[in-house]
Amino acid sequence: MVGVLPDQVPNDEGGVFANFFGQQALTMTLVSKLVARSQARVFCGFVVRLPKSGGFKLTIQEADQSIYDEDLITSVAGLNKSVENCVLMAVEQYQWEYKRFRRQLDRKKFY
C-alpha cells in the first residue's frame, strides 16, 4: 500500500494541467504513472472531524474509474475527480487555504 497526497502542487516536470473544480490546476502525474506500471487499484481516503469533539470518521472509497485510462491527461483528470468526490462529502473541512491554483498555464498570479 502506498499513500499519496494527490492535491499537492508538483514541480513542472512532475505534473500536467487538469480540471479541478472548474479550474485548470497543475496536478501530479505520479499516481497515474504508478497505476500504469502496476495495474494497482486506487482508493481515496479522508478523515472528517465529527461535531462536538466526537472524534473522526475515516472514509475510504474507490477512485474515479478514469484514473485507469491509458491516456495520461485523462488519468490525471480522474485523480482530480477522485479528490473532488472526497471534498464534496465534507466541503467545509477541505483545506481551502492551500493554494492549489498558484501555478497557472499562463504563469499569471491566481492569488
Question: Where in the sequence are the language-model features?
Answer:
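Non-catalytic C-terminal accessory region of glycerolipid acyltransferases
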Residues: 1-111
